[in-house]
Structure formats: structure tokens, C-alpha cells
Amino acid sequence: MTNTMKENSNYDIIDVIIENVTKEWEESMKNNSINKEKWEVPKYSKSEINKAGKIIANPKSSKEDRDNALVILNNWRASHAYPLQVICTNLRRKNPNAIVVQRLKRLESITGKIERFPEMQLYKMQDLGGCRVIVETIDQVYEAVRKYKKSYIKHIFKKENDYIKNPKESGYRSYHMVYKFYSDKKETYNNNMLIEIQFRTKLQHVWATAVEMMGIYTKSNLKASQGDKEILRFFTIVSSIFAIQENMPTCPNTPRFMEDLIPEMKELNEKHKILDILSALKVSIDYTTKLNFKNKNLYYLLILDYIKGKVQIRSFPTSKVELATKVYDNIEKSSTKDVVLVSATSFDTLKFAYPNYFVDISDFIDTLQSIITGYENDLKEDKLIEQQILKKNS
């Protein structure tokens, strides 16, 4: 443990949680049969799961009701780990050059979604388990989508949304597919386990990351279109600028051409200093001695304390995924830190796919500034050519 961690009581709390949960889990493993499943299985009915979602999203719920509901929700969420692992492993095989990562949805995101959409049922929430495929180009996005659709899988296709050709008003761009998991070998998971797959380019990914980081700074859920309207507008405008770079449609209610988009973006940035804020965000990373970067089958707990500028990382082998989900559940209940449980094939992949937990916005800023510089150089060149023509004809 680093000296920083020893001196920081908040980090001590995290370590105590991990130590206590690990002891309980190891004891339960001793008491159970040798062939105990390493993957969590669903234990509750559809009605119990939906009721739990409503209780947790209701601020008037009693502590006892909420605690009982959390047990149900955590089991339902953790049960998605196995279907998610199967689908993401398949995606990695089909897309060896892509960055493929997976995550179980954060409790705060689950409750926030139910609060925003009161009619939503937790049992039918389509992104409790999410897999993200990140590639270089638009063509590679559609090729990855095509390959997965044509593959011989037994999972049941439920829906798709092309937010690249039809961007959201917020500026969000990605290609989504939802499948209902099916297995001949693990029938216990054939129980409406929905997995969402997101296909996106690196440019779309760095935009989404910047939105999330600015949301943390402003303490508003910008990615759900909540917060300062002008800051939201800035990111929508930037998304349209990026869309033009990828030769794709711009976002609704934004100009269609760079000569209109860039001046508006610069005006909003000048007013709110958004790029300066993003550039200034930094954290120090405590990797801890518990990480093993040589192991390619790891689950990572990313624990971000933005106020103190610290991020902790804990790793778990796939054989201990049940322990990882239990630690995840307990940290969410006992700490105010921003925490997520994810899986990636390497640390570099992890860092690129979740840069918001490492506060690395450099790709977003560098790309945007490069586009602006290129646009301004083109304007200067056009003006120079025009002056030369006028001089020649005078």
C-alpha cells in the first residue's frame, strides 16, 4: 500500500471493505461445494426485480426496504456477468484489432435511469450488461456490425439503433444493438438477460468521454442532457464538427457546415472556458501491488475520487468474478466514490476505453484543436488565393 493510501482515511475505508468482503467470500467458498459456480445466477422473479427497482429509485423508501431491494438488484445485475463475458469474448474473436471492453452498469446510473423513465422496468433494462467495441473508422463500425449480425449465434436479436446516421440531439453518436442471451449449456441464464453492444469510432468515444468528465466537474449529468444549456450546446456543436470529419450527418438543430459550427463552438468555449477546464483536470493513479497486468483475463474495479484527484484500481481474475461483483456492490453502498466494475484484455485497453477514470482528455482536446487549426489554415489559404486573383486582375 502506498503512503498516500495510508494517510488517506477514505482509501482506508475502501481497503477495509475489500478485505472484509474477501474474507466473507473465502469463508463461503470453504463452506460450499467444490463445484460451486464462479458466476452469479438469478435468484428472484420478474415481479420482485421490478419492485426492487421502484423501491431503490424512490427517495421516500425506508432504509430496510431499500437494503432488501439492493440485494435483489445486485443479484440481478451480477447475474449478467456470465452472458456479458460470453458475448464480449465472441466480439473480441471477431474483431481482433478493435478495443473491446465490458462493464456492469453502475448503481447510480441504474437508479438515475429509472427516475428519468418511471415506466421502465428493471427486469427489462437493456444495458445492465454492456459491451463496447471501439474501432478507427466508420467503415469498420459497420463492418463489425455486419459480421456480428451474420455470425452463427443463438442469442435473440431484440433491437438496434444507428445513432451515427441518426445522431441524438445531445450529440451522442454510436451504433447500438441489444440481444437477449441464450445458452444451451447454461439454461439458468435464459431468463431475459439483455446485453447491449455499442459500436463506435475512437472519435465518437473521445467525445463521449469529454462529456462525462465535464459532467463530473459541473456535478451534472450532461450525458443525460441535464445541466447548463450552453455547455450542452458546446458538446452538441463539437459532435457535429466530428461528424463532418467522418463524413456523416450532423446533429439535429445544429449548422451543417464548418464555417458556422466552429465560430459558435469558439464563442461558447470562450464564455465557459470548457477546454481550459478539461485540460486542467488531473488525477494521480494508485495502481497498488494487487494488479497483475500480465494476466489477460481480469476484472478491474476503478474507484475515482474526483475531489481529491485520486483513482484506485483493483484487479480480480475471472475465476473470482463473483468476489469482484460483491466488492463492487459493497463499495457502492458504503462509499460516495465513483466506482465501476469492468473487464478488458490489457491495461492499455482499459485506460483507453475508460479515460474518464484516468482523467485523460488529451485526445479530445488535441483532435478538436487540430480540426480548428486546419480550418483556420484553409481560410487563410483561401483568402490569400483570393487576394492573388484580385491583384492579378487589377
Residue ranges with predicted function:
Residues 4-69, 73-79, 190-300, 304:
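An acidic, glycine-/histidine-flanked metal-binding catalytic module
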Residues 65-116, 310-311:
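Surface-exposed, low-hydrophobicity interaction/linker segments
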Residues 115-126, 302-303, 329-331:
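Short, flexible, solvent-exposed loop/turn segments with mixed acidic/basic and small polar residues
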Residues 136-140:
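Helix N-cap motif at beta-to-alpha junctions
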Residues 148, 154-186:
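Short Gly/Thr-rich strand-loop-strand
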Residues 310-319, 339-342:
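A short, exposed loop/beta-hairpin motif centered on an aromatic-Gly-Thr core
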Residues 320-333:
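A short, charged, amphipathic alpha-helix used as a generic interaction element across diverse proteins
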Residues 335-383:
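Short, mixed-charge low-complexity intrinsically disordered segments
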